[in-house]
Amino acid sequence: MTEQLKDFDVAEHLTSEEEIQLYLNEILQEDNIELILSALGDIARARNMSQIARDAGISREGLYKALSGTGNPTFATVMKVMKALNLQFQVQQSRFA
């Protein structure tokens, strides 16, 4: 008998504000815009994608596309999503000189 493995979905494990902050901060260290957008999508799914889309003032489909690997959202869109997620960027000196 073969055991079926379930696909891992990080959104299912983002159950607290602390986990969300730690996750996004780690992803931001990677300096990979596609990965960052994907992480924002994970967080939006963990928090209710439809509600986040409404709060950001964009369609649910538009939000999925913007935060997909093929999306190319404007910085304004990213900031609207961050605000809807109740998150903000914080600037500090780079550890990479």
UniProtKB/Swiss-Prot annotation:
GO molecular function: DNA binding
Signal peptide: none
SUPFAM superfamilies: lambda repressor-like DNA-binding domains (SSF47413)
InterPro entries listed in its UniProt record: Cro/C1-type_HTH, HI1420, Lambda_DNA-bd_dom_sf
PANTHER family reported in the protein's UniProt record: SSL7038 PROTEIN
Protein name (record): Uncharacterized protein HI_1420
Source organism of this protein record: Haemophilus influenzae (strain ATCC 51907 / DSM 11121 / KW20 / Rd)
